Amino acid sequence: MLPAVSAHLVIRLGGKPMRLFAGDADEVGEFISHSVIGGVRDAAYLKDSSDFAPTVGVVFRPGAAGAFLGVPTDSFAGSHTPLDAFWGQAEVENLRSELAEAPALERRIEILEHALLRRLPRIRGVDPAIVQAALLLERRPVGKVATALDWSHRHLIARFSEAVGLSPKRYARLVRFGRVLLRLERQPETGLAEIAQDAGYADQAHFNRDFRSFSGISPGEYRKAGGTGCHVPEQNRPENSRR
């Protein structure tokens, strides 16, 4: 699995708990839970996708996950944490049972949405300044974003990192990486040099280096493996290892 700028909630309604691997040499892995919060990550991770089960989940907007969980987003960044660590075991098991008994996907989405909305009276909303910063960082350098918000560079880094779980610079790089992934998937005939130039990389080497730092593979290898979004099939990726 490749990194992205958003935290996510996943609830498996059957099968085994989510299993992650420490690396290619790890043949056992670690079972996390059926209900998991995936924090914002800036590196790829290895997940077992062989045990298919019905699943429902949420991808949070930047900064929103921490609001719904009642803790700073940076406190669970870079990790996968059982949902009951935030909501309590009884509440999570009741929610999972209700989701499993629902007759259709649309109903499951409604149930999960209502579960999140019920928490709104107990949480603080996402700081509008953080929302604005996230939008500005998609197109502007960090220094100009700080100026636009009338914040110091240091204050922007501290506030944004706590709310989103990534530094502003790292967030901006991951946003660009996400745009590149989308284009690689949707425009298979477009050359890598053109994609690199349009994304604002200095040259092809810069593009390859940045892409590999997040994914562990080159853009060409990703395209050859048939990657879709943040997913690279195990059997198709280089060295045939899990990702």
Predicted regions and their residues:
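Alpha-helical bundle regulatory/interaction domains
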Residues: 1-153, 163-168, 182-187, 191-202, ...
